């Protein structure tokens, strides 16, 4: 069986990595070895940060809900407990959107939570 030299395959594979490394600084977009290393690191960061993004958005929503709830004389934890008691099923994303874009609707939700807590 004759020996097959992998020139075209190797070139294609390296070209693919260098294309992924486009926009990197210094040798990291020019040299295969450093580009390959950086692309692997970038993949690791992307994997980690896709999960981090979910945590970050949840933190942002909670901060917005807390700020709006405190403007209505209620803490975040009291509001969430009140909503649970009142059986109002709204997720944090929806509540944060109400707090930012429709203050009157958010105030009515807070009043419903207060009423449920005072029963």
From Swiss-Prot:
Gene assigned in the entry: rplT
Name under which the protein is recorded: Large ribosomal subunit protein bL20
UniProt xrefs under Gene3D superfamilies: 6.10.160.10, Ribosomal protein L20 (1.10.1900.20)
Stored SUPFAM superfamilies: Ribosomal protein L20 (SSF74731)
GO BP term (any one): translation
CC per GO annotation: ribonucleoprotein complex; ribosome
Role: Binds directly to 23S ribosomal RNA and is necessary for the in vitro assembly process of the 50S ribosomal subunit. It is not involved in the protein synthesizing functions of that subunit.
Molecular-function GO terms, alphabetical: rRNA binding; structural constituent of ribosome
Classification lineage: Bacteria, Bacillati, Bacillota, Bacilli, Lactobacillales
Family: Belongs to the bacterial ribosomal protein bL20 family.
Pfam (any one): Ribosomal_L20
Keywords: Ribonucleoprotein, Ribosomal protein, RNA-binding, rRNA-binding
